[in-house]
Protein backbone atom coordinates (compact mmCIF):
# COMPACT_ATOMS: atom_id res chain seq x y z
CA UNK A 1 0.00 0.00 0.00
CA UNK A 2 2.90 2.38 0.42
CA UNK A 3 2.96 4.41 -2.76
CA UNK A 4 5.19 7.40 -2.08
CA UNK A 5 7.90 6.24 0.33
CA UNK A 6 7.75 8.72 3.16
CA UNK A 7 5.88 11.64 1.61
CA UNK A 8 2.72 12.27 3.58
CA UNK A 9 0.66 13.70 0.75
CA UNK A 10 -2.70 15.24 1.42
CA UNK A 11 -4.53 15.79 -1.83
CA UNK A 12 -6.69 18.78 -0.89
CA UNK A 13 -7.25 20.18 -4.36
CA UNK A 14 -6.67 19.78 -8.06
CA UNK A 15 -5.65 22.09 -10.86
CA UNK A 16 -8.96 21.92 -12.70
CA UNK A 17 -7.95 24.03 -15.67
CA UNK A 18 -5.04 21.75 -16.44
CA UNK A 19 -7.27 18.73 -16.18
CA UNK A 20 -9.77 20.11 -18.65
CA UNK A 21 -7.01 20.81 -21.15
CA UNK A 22 -5.48 17.39 -20.74
CA UNK A 23 -8.77 15.53 -20.48
CA UNK A 24 -8.91 14.82 -24.19
CA UNK A 25 -5.51 13.19 -24.20
CA UNK A 26 -4.64 9.53 -23.73
CA UNK A 27 -7.03 6.63 -24.17
CA UNK A 28 -9.66 8.69 -25.94
CA UNK A 29 -11.28 10.27 -22.87
CA UNK A 30 -13.45 13.23 -23.85
CA UNK A 31 -12.74 15.00 -20.56
CA UNK A 32 -11.77 13.96 -17.09
CA UNK A 33 -14.73 14.18 -14.68
CA UNK A 34 -14.43 16.41 -11.62
CA UNK A 35 -11.49 15.14 -9.62
CA UNK A 36 -11.37 14.48 -5.90
CA UNK A 37 -11.92 17.89 -4.43
CA UNK A 38 -13.98 16.50 -1.56
CA UNK A 39 -12.35 15.09 1.54
CA UNK A 40 -13.51 13.62 4.81
CA UNK A 41 -17.06 12.81 3.71
CA UNK A 42 -19.54 10.90 5.82
CA UNK A 43 -20.04 7.38 4.50
CA UNK A 44 -23.44 7.87 2.84
CA UNK A 45 -22.25 11.17 1.38
CA UNK A 46 -19.14 9.45 0.00
CA UNK A 47 -21.29 6.89 -1.82
CA UNK A 48 -23.42 9.65 -3.37
CA UNK A 49 -20.31 11.58 -4.45
CA UNK A 50 -19.00 8.76 -6.64
CA UNK A 51 -19.32 8.92 -10.41
CA UNK A 52 -20.19 5.59 -12.06
CA UNK A 53 -21.03 4.79 -15.70
CA UNK A 54 -24.66 5.03 -16.87
CA UNK A 55 -26.74 2.21 -15.43
CA UNK A 56 -24.45 1.69 -12.44
CA UNK A 57 -24.94 2.86 -8.87
CA UNK A 58 -22.84 2.67 -5.72
CA UNK A 59 -24.43 1.18 -2.60
CA UNK A 60 -23.06 1.66 0.91
CA UNK A 61 -22.96 -1.81 2.47
CA UNK A 62 -21.36 -0.92 5.81
CA UNK A 63 -19.29 1.81 7.45
CA UNK A 64 -17.82 2.98 10.71
CA UNK A 65 -18.39 2.13 13.52
CA UNK A 66 -19.42 -1.31 12.20
CA UNK A 67 -16.14 -1.61 10.32
CA UNK A 68 -12.86 0.29 10.67
CA UNK A 69 -9.46 -0.15 9.04
CA UNK A 70 -10.60 -2.79 6.49
CA UNK A 71 -7.47 -4.16 4.84
CA UNK A 72 -8.57 -7.49 3.32
CA UNK A 73 -11.75 -9.35 2.44
CA UNK A 74 -13.12 -12.54 0.89
CA UNK A 75 -16.42 -14.32 0.30
CA UNK A 76 -17.33 -17.73 1.70
CA UNK A 77 -19.47 -20.50 0.20
CA UNK A 78 -22.60 -18.91 1.72
CA UNK A 79 -21.96 -15.61 0.00
CA UNK A 80 -21.00 -13.87 3.23
CA UNK A 81 -18.28 -11.24 3.34
CA UNK A 82 -15.30 -11.73 5.67
CA UNK A 83 -13.29 -8.61 6.46
CA UNK A 84 -9.98 -8.09 8.27
CA UNK A 85 -9.68 -4.95 10.39
CA UNK A 86 -6.04 -3.94 10.87
CA UNK A 87 -5.67 -1.47 13.73
CA UNK A 88 -1.95 -2.18 14.15
CA UNK A 89 -0.92 -0.86 10.73
CA UNK A 90 1.65 0.46 9.97
CA UNK A 91 3.65 -0.88 12.93
CA UNK A 92 3.35 -4.18 14.74
CA UNK A 93 2.13 -3.71 18.32
CA UNK A 94 3.22 -5.31 21.59
CA UNK A 95 1.28 -8.57 21.93
CA UNK A 96 -0.83 -7.23 24.80
CA UNK A 97 -2.10 -4.37 22.61
CA UNK A 98 -2.97 -6.41 19.51
CA UNK A 99 -6.60 -5.94 18.50
CA UNK A 100 -6.92 -6.67 14.79
CA UNK A 101 -10.14 -8.56 14.07
CA UNK A 102 -11.91 -10.79 11.59
CA UNK A 103 -15.54 -9.87 10.96
CA UNK A 104 -18.29 -11.76 9.12
CA UNK A 105 -20.92 -9.66 7.34
CA UNK A 106 -24.15 -10.78 5.69
CA UNK A 107 -27.01 -9.11 3.85
CA UNK A 108 -29.92 -11.12 5.27
CA UNK A 109 -32.79 -9.36 3.49
CA UNK A 110 -31.30 -8.56 0.08
CA UNK A 111 -31.37 -4.77 0.36
CA UNK A 112 -27.65 -4.23 -0.33
CA UNK A 113 -26.96 -3.46 3.33
CA UNK A 114 -24.82 -5.73 5.50
CA UNK A 115 -27.22 -5.98 8.43
CA UNK A 116 -25.62 -9.00 10.16
CA UNK A 117 -22.17 -8.74 11.73
CA UNK A 118 -20.17 -11.25 13.77
CA UNK A 119 -16.69 -11.19 15.25
CA UNK A 120 -14.92 -14.42 14.29
CA UNK A 121 -11.53 -13.71 15.86
CA UNK A 122 -9.71 -10.84 17.54
CA UNK A 123 -6.36 -10.09 19.12
CA UNK A 124 -4.47 -10.43 15.85
CA UNK A 125 -1.41 -8.31 15.13
CA UNK A 126 -0.72 -6.71 11.74
CA UNK A 127 -3.25 -8.90 9.93
CA UNK A 128 -3.12 -8.34 6.17
CA UNK A 129 -4.74 -11.20 4.24
CA UNK A 130 -7.66 -13.63 4.48
CA UNK A 131 -9.20 -16.59 2.66
CA UNK A 132 -11.91 -19.05 3.73
CA UNK A 133 -11.91 -22.71 2.72
CA UNK A 134 -10.80 -26.27 3.47
CA UNK A 135 -12.43 -26.30 6.88
CA UNK A 136 -11.25 -23.00 8.23
CA UNK A 137 -9.91 -19.51 7.78
CA UNK A 138 -6.46 -18.60 6.43
CA UNK A 139 -4.97 -15.39 7.76
CA UNK A 140 -1.73 -13.54 7.07
CA UNK A 141 -0.26 -11.73 10.08
CA UNK A 142 3.51 -11.33 9.73
CA UNK A 143 5.61 -13.15 10.74
CA UNK A 144 3.03 -15.95 10.35
CA UNK A 145 0.54 -17.55 8.00
CA UNK A 146 -2.22 -18.80 10.31
CA UNK A 147 -5.09 -21.27 9.98
CA UNK A 148 -8.16 -20.99 12.20
CA UNK A 149 -9.93 -24.37 12.09
CA UNK A 150 -13.73 -24.26 11.93
CA UNK A 151 -14.69 -27.70 10.68
CA UNK A 152 -18.36 -27.39 11.65
CA UNK A 153 -18.66 -23.92 10.08
CA UNK A 154 -20.35 -22.48 13.16
CA UNK A 155 -18.33 -19.26 12.94
CA UNK A 156 -16.44 -20.09 16.12
CA UNK A 157 -12.81 -21.26 15.83
CA UNK A 158 -12.40 -24.89 16.88
CA UNK A 159 -9.25 -23.93 18.77
CA UNK A 160 -6.30 -21.57 18.66
CA UNK A 161 -4.88 -20.79 15.21
CA UNK A 162 -2.25 -23.10 13.79
CA UNK A 163 0.98 -21.54 12.61
CA UNK A 164 1.43 -23.02 9.14
CA UNK A 165 4.41 -20.90 8.10
CA UNK A 166 6.60 -18.35 9.81
CA UNK A 167 9.48 -16.14 8.75
CA UNK A 168 7.41 -13.51 6.96
CA UNK A 169 9.23 -10.19 7.19
CA UNK A 170 7.84 -6.86 8.32
CA UNK A 171 10.66 -4.42 7.60
CA UNK A 172 8.16 -2.48 5.51
CA UNK A 173 4.69 -3.31 6.74
CA UNK A 174 3.17 -1.87 3.57
CA UNK A 175 4.66 -4.84 1.73
CA UNK A 176 4.10 -8.02 3.70
CA UNK A 177 1.89 -10.97 2.69
CA UNK A 178 -1.42 -9.76 1.22
CA UNK A 179 -4.13 -10.17 -1.42
CA UNK A 180 -5.03 -13.81 -0.70
CA UNK A 181 -6.94 -15.60 -3.45
CA UNK A 182 -7.71 -19.22 -4.30
CA UNK A 183 -6.25 -20.11 -7.66
CA UNK A 184 -8.00 -22.34 -10.22
CA UNK A 185 -5.51 -25.07 -9.25
CA UNK A 186 -6.67 -25.08 -5.62
CA UNK A 187 -3.57 -23.37 -4.23
CA UNK A 188 -3.76 -20.29 -2.02
CA UNK A 189 -1.99 -17.36 -3.72
CA UNK A 190 -0.78 -14.08 -2.28
CA UNK A 191 1.45 -11.08 -2.97
CA UNK A 192 4.64 -9.81 -1.32
CA UNK A 193 6.49 -6.50 -1.69
CA UNK A 194 10.07 -5.63 -2.58
CA UNK A 195 11.25 -3.85 0.56
CA UNK A 196 10.25 -6.62 2.98
CA UNK A 197 12.51 -9.66 3.15
CA UNK A 198 11.05 -13.02 4.14
CA UNK A 199 12.59 -16.42 4.79
CA UNK A 200 9.52 -18.65 4.89
CA UNK A 201 9.16 -22.15 6.25
CA UNK A 202 7.23 -24.33 8.65
CA UNK A 203 7.98 -23.53 12.29
CA UNK A 204 11.38 -24.95 13.19
CA UNK A 205 12.69 -25.03 9.62
CA UNK A 206 16.46 -24.36 9.57
CA UNK A 207 17.45 -21.02 8.12
CA UNK A 208 19.30 -22.73 5.27
CA UNK A 209 16.14 -24.56 4.15
CA UNK A 210 13.79 -21.59 4.13
CA UNK A 211 12.30 -20.09 0.97
CA UNK A 212 13.33 -16.50 0.26
CA UNK A 213 10.96 -13.93 -1.18
CA UNK A 214 11.07 -10.15 -1.29
CA UNK A 215 8.92 -9.32 -4.30
CA UNK A 216 6.46 -11.43 -6.20
CA UNK A 217 3.67 -13.93 -5.81
CA UNK A 218 3.75 -16.97 -3.55
CA UNK A 219 1.41 -19.94 -3.18
CA UNK A 220 0.56 -22.55 -0.55
CA UNK A 221 -1.12 -25.93 -1.07
CA UNK A 222 -3.88 -26.38 1.54
CA UNK A 223 -3.76 -30.19 1.57
CA UNK A 224 -0.10 -31.04 0.96
CA UNK A 225 1.07 -27.99 2.96
CA UNK A 226 3.69 -27.06 0.40
CA UNK A 227 4.95 -23.50 -0.04
CA UNK A 228 6.67 -22.05 -3.08
CA UNK A 229 7.39 -18.80 -4.87
CA UNK A 230 5.18 -18.64 -7.96
CA UNK A 231 6.91 -15.65 -9.57
CA UNK A 232 9.55 -13.08 -8.65
CA UNK A 233 9.72 -9.35 -9.08
CA UNK A 234 7.63 -6.19 -9.54
CA UNK A 235 7.33 -3.73 -6.67
CA UNK A 236 4.71 -3.62 -3.95
CA UNK A 237 1.87 -5.67 -5.42
CA UNK A 238 -1.52 -5.63 -3.68
CA UNK A 239 -3.51 -7.46 -6.31
CA UNK A 240 -3.52 -10.72 -8.26
CA UNK A 241 -6.38 -12.40 -10.12
CA UNK A 242 -7.05 -15.08 -12.74
CA UNK A 243 -8.95 -14.86 -16.01
CA UNK A 244 -11.37 -17.48 -17.33
CA UNK A 245 -8.45 -19.46 -18.79
CA UNK A 246 -6.70 -19.64 -15.42
CA UNK A 247 -3.97 -17.16 -16.38
CA UNK A 248 -2.67 -14.91 -13.60
CA UNK A 249 -2.37 -11.12 -13.73
CA UNK A 250 -0.76 -8.83 -11.19
CA UNK A 251 -0.94 -5.09 -10.51
CA UNK A 252 1.93 -3.02 -9.10
CA UNK A 253 2.97 0.40 -7.80
CA UNK A 254 5.64 2.91 -8.91
CA UNK A 255 6.89 0.81 -11.84
CA UNK A 256 4.62 -0.07 -14.80
CA UNK A 257 1.37 -1.34 -13.37
CA UNK A 258 0.32 -4.57 -15.13
CA UNK A 259 1.91 -8.02 -15.60
CA UNK A 260 0.82 -11.36 -17.03
CA UNK A 261 2.38 -13.74 -14.52
CA UNK A 262 3.58 -17.28 -15.27
CA UNK A 263 5.10 -19.89 -12.93
CA UNK A 264 8.80 -19.29 -12.44
CA UNK A 265 8.74 -15.93 -14.20
CA UNK A 266 11.10 -13.15 -13.13
CA UNK A 267 9.64 -9.70 -13.63
CA UNK A 268 10.87 -6.14 -13.65
CA UNK A 269 11.83 -5.04 -10.13
CA UNK A 270 11.43 -1.67 -8.49
CA UNK A 271 14.64 -2.27 -6.53
CA UNK A 272 17.16 -4.94 -5.60
CA UNK A 273 18.39 -7.94 -7.54
CA UNK A 274 16.88 -11.26 -8.50
CA UNK A 275 17.95 -14.13 -6.25
CA UNK A 276 19.59 -15.88 -9.18
CA UNK A 277 22.62 -13.71 -10.07
CA UNK A 278 22.74 -15.26 -13.54
CA UNK A 279 19.40 -13.76 -14.54
CA UNK A 280 20.12 -12.11 -17.90
CA UNK A 281 16.97 -10.03 -18.07
CA UNK A 282 13.50 -9.93 -16.61
CA UNK A 283 9.99 -9.81 -18.04
CA UNK A 284 8.47 -6.38 -18.59
CA UNK A 285 4.95 -5.05 -18.29
CA UNK A 286 2.25 -6.05 -20.75
CA UNK A 287 0.68 -2.58 -20.48
CA UNK A 288 0.89 -0.37 -23.55
CA UNK A 289 -0.13 2.67 -21.51
CA UNK A 290 0.54 4.35 -18.19
CA UNK A 291 -1.76 5.86 -15.58
CA UNK A 292 0.63 8.65 -14.67
CA UNK A 293 2.65 11.39 -16.35
CA UNK A 294 6.32 12.29 -16.14
CA UNK A 295 9.44 10.19 -15.77
CA UNK A 296 9.37 10.13 -11.98
CA UNK A 297 6.29 10.61 -9.82
CA UNK A 298 6.00 13.89 -7.95
CA UNK A 299 3.21 16.19 -6.86
CA UNK A 300 3.67 18.45 -9.86
CA UNK A 301 2.67 15.58 -12.15
CA UNK A 302 -0.77 15.19 -10.56
CA UNK A 303 -2.75 17.41 -12.91
CA UNK A 304 -1.32 15.70 -16.00
CA UNK A 305 -1.72 12.26 -14.43
CA UNK A 306 -5.40 12.89 -13.69
CA UNK A 307 -6.12 12.88 -17.41
CA UNK A 308 -4.55 9.47 -18.05
CA UNK A 309 -5.51 7.38 -15.04
CA UNK A 310 -4.68 9.23 -11.83
CA UNK A 311 -1.25 8.15 -10.66
CA UNK A 312 1.38 5.46 -10.26
CA UNK A 313 0.01 3.60 -7.22
CA UNK A 314 -2.45 0.73 -7.58
CA UNK A 315 -4.19 -1.58 -5.14
CA UNK A 316 -6.38 -4.55 -5.90
CA UNK A 317 -6.84 -6.60 -9.07
CA UNK A 318 -10.21 -7.91 -10.16
CA UNK A 319 -10.94 -9.50 -13.53
CA UNK A 320 -14.68 -9.24 -14.04
CA UNK A 321 -16.11 -12.70 -14.75
CA UNK A 322 -19.59 -12.19 -13.31
CA UNK A 323 -22.79 -12.25 -15.32
CA UNK A 324 -24.56 -9.15 -14.01
CA UNK A 325 -22.68 -6.39 -15.84
CA UNK A 326 -22.72 -5.49 -19.54
CA UNK A 327 -20.75 -7.95 -21.63
CA UNK A 328 -18.10 -5.43 -22.68
CA UNK A 329 -16.74 -5.39 -19.11
CA UNK A 330 -16.29 -9.16 -18.99
CA UNK A 331 -12.67 -10.29 -18.86
CA UNK A 332 -11.33 -6.82 -18.15
CA UNK A 333 -9.14 -6.06 -15.17
CA UNK A 334 -10.13 -3.44 -12.62
CA UNK A 335 -7.76 -1.88 -10.09
CA UNK A 336 -7.87 1.03 -7.69
CA UNK A 337 -5.72 4.03 -8.49
CA UNK A 338 -4.83 5.36 -5.05
CA UNK A 339 -3.67 8.88 -5.91
CA UNK A 340 -6.37 9.22 -8.54
CA UNK A 341 -9.16 7.99 -6.22
CA UNK A 342 -10.75 5.96 -8.99
CA UNK A 343 -11.01 2.53 -10.55
CA UNK A 344 -8.91 2.01 -13.67
CA UNK A 345 -10.10 -0.57 -16.20
CA UNK A 346 -7.66 -2.39 -18.49
CA UNK A 347 -8.41 -4.58 -21.50
CA UNK A 348 -6.44 -7.85 -21.71
CA UNK A 349 -5.87 -9.08 -25.26
CA UNK A 350 -4.07 -12.34 -26.15
CA UNK A 351 -0.87 -11.71 -28.10
CA UNK A 352 1.45 -14.55 -29.05
CA UNK A 353 2.13 -16.62 -25.95
CA UNK A 354 0.98 -13.84 -23.63
CA UNK A 355 -1.16 -10.73 -23.48
CA UNK A 356 -1.10 -7.00 -23.99
CA UNK A 357 -2.93 -4.57 -21.74
CA UNK A 358 -4.64 -1.43 -22.98
CA UNK A 359 -6.45 1.23 -21.00
CA UNK A 360 -10.19 1.67 -21.10
CA UNK A 361 -11.84 4.87 -19.87
CA UNK A 362 -11.60 5.03 -16.09
CA UNK A 363 -14.58 3.15 -14.69
CA UNK A 364 -15.47 4.87 -11.42
CA UNK A 365 -14.45 8.11 -9.72
CA UNK A 366 -14.67 8.45 -5.93
CA UNK A 367 -14.38 12.26 -6.21
CA UNK A 368 -12.95 12.17 -2.70
CA UNK A 369 -9.24 12.39 -1.96
CA UNK A 370 -9.57 10.29 1.20
CA UNK A 371 -10.96 7.28 -0.66
CA UNK A 372 -8.55 4.34 -0.77
CA UNK A 373 -10.05 1.12 -2.13
CA UNK A 374 -7.68 -1.60 -0.93
CA UNK A 375 -9.43 -4.62 -2.42
CA UNK A 376 -12.16 -5.22 -5.00
CA UNK A 377 -13.92 -8.52 -5.61
CA UNK A 378 -16.96 -9.78 -7.49
CA UNK A 379 -19.58 -11.20 -5.16
CA UNK A 380 -21.96 -14.11 -5.77
CA UNK A 381 -24.53 -11.73 -7.29
CA UNK A 382 -22.08 -10.62 -9.98
CA UNK A 383 -21.67 -7.12 -8.54
CA UNK A 384 -18.32 -5.68 -7.40
CA UNK A 385 -17.59 -5.07 -3.72
CA UNK A 386 -14.94 -2.55 -2.62
CA UNK A 387 -13.39 -2.09 0.81
CA UNK A 388 -12.30 1.48 1.48
CA UNK A 389 -9.49 2.15 3.97
CA UNK A 390 -10.58 5.81 3.89
CA UNK A 391 -7.81 8.07 5.18
CA UNK A 392 -6.49 11.52 4.33
CA UNK A 393 -2.93 10.15 4.24
CA UNK A 394 -1.87 7.71 1.54
CA UNK A 395 1.58 6.90 2.94
CA UNK A 396 1.72 5.79 6.53
CA UNK A 397 5.27 5.79 7.79
CA UNK A 398 4.37 7.37 11.12
CA UNK A 399 2.02 5.48 13.39
CA UNK A 400 0.04 8.56 14.39
CA UNK A 401 -0.59 9.45 10.74
CA UNK A 402 -3.32 6.81 10.46
CA UNK A 403 -6.98 7.61 11.15
CA UNK A 404 -8.33 4.45 12.80
CA UNK A 405 -11.86 5.74 13.27
CA UNK A 406 -13.39 4.79 9.95
CA UNK A 407 -13.73 2.37 7.05
CA UNK A 408 -16.32 1.64 4.38
CA UNK A 409 -17.62 -1.19 2.25
CA UNK A 410 -19.31 -0.33 -1.04
CA UNK A 411 -20.94 -2.31 -3.82
CA UNK A 412 -21.04 -1.24 -7.47
CA UNK A 413 -24.40 -2.46 -8.80
CA UNK A 414 -25.72 -2.54 -12.36
CA UNK A 415 -29.38 -1.60 -12.91
CA UNK A 416 -30.28 -2.09 -9.24
CA UNK A 417 -30.08 -5.85 -9.64
CA UNK A 418 -31.31 -7.99 -6.78
CA UNK A 419 -28.96 -9.85 -4.49
CA UNK A 420 -28.78 -13.64 -4.60
CA UNK A 421 -28.67 -16.25 -1.87
CA UNK A 422 -26.05 -19.00 -2.19
CA UNK A 423 -24.96 -22.01 -0.17
CA UNK A 424 -22.39 -23.79 -2.29
CA UNK A 425 -21.32 -26.08 0.54
CA UNK A 426 -24.71 -27.78 0.40
CA UNK A 427 -24.49 -28.66 -3.28
CA UNK A 428 -23.29 -31.88 -4.87
CA UNK A 429 -20.34 -32.05 -7.25
CA UNK A 430 -22.76 -32.32 -10.17
CA UNK A 431 -24.69 -29.26 -9.07
CA UNK A 432 -21.48 -27.28 -8.71
CA UNK A 433 -20.34 -28.28 -12.20
CA UNK A 434 -23.71 -27.19 -13.59
CA UNK A 435 -23.16 -23.72 -12.21
Question: PLM ranges: what are they?
Answer:
Residues 5, 15-18, 425:
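Intrinsic-disorder-associated interaction segments
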Residues 28-435:
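Beta-propeller domains with acidic blade repeats across secreted/periplasmic ectodomains
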Residues 14-27:
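Bacterial N-terminal signal peptides
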Residues 1-11:
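N-terminal secretory signal peptides that target proteins for export/translocation
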Amino acid sequence: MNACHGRDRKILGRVIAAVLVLGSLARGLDAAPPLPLAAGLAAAEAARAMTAPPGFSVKLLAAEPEVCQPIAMCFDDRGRLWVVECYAYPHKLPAAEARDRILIFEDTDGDHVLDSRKVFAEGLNLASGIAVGFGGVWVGAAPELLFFPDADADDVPDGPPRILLDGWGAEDTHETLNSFIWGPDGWLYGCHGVFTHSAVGKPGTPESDRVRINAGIWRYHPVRHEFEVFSEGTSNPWGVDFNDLGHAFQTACVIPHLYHVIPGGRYQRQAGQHFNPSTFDDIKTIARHRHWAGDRWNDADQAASDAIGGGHAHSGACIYLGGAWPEHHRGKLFMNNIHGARLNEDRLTPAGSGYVGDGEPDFLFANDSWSQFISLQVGPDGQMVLIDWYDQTQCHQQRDAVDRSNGRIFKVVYENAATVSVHLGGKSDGELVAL
